[in-house]
Amino acid sequence: MELELRYSAEDISRIIEQALVYQCACPAQIATTLLELRDLFDYQVKCGDTDDTNRRVHEAIARATAEAHTRMERCLDEVLDIEGWDRNTLTMPEALRARPTKSL
């Protein structure tokens, strides 16, 4: 089982960096969630249980994680489009760079 990635780890790091520098939490929260889902997926896939029940448990978690990851990548696409990010450079638009600070 493989996880399909629309965004590389470097892309996600760039989004988080932009969001932290310019204090815009929403894209960073989604990006951080994607990294956490990737870690969870990797753990479930690599868990080498040979016991049938445990194997099935890990497969179920991996499948659900892959589905959540796909949905969150689509959500990130939508958020970046709505906010007007430059999709080639993953640069936040100027208008968002001056927003007041909210909790990251």
What is each stretch, according to the model?
Residues 30-33, 37-40, 44-47, 57-75, ...:
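Amphipathic alpha-helices that form helix-helix packing interfaces
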Residues 62-104:
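Amphipathic alpha-helical binding modules
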Residues 2-3:
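A conserved regulatory-domain signal marking ACT and ACT-like small-molecule sensing domains
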Residues 6-21, 46-56:
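Short, charged/polar, low-complexity loop and linker segments
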Residues 19-31:
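Short, charge/polar-rich alpha-helical segments
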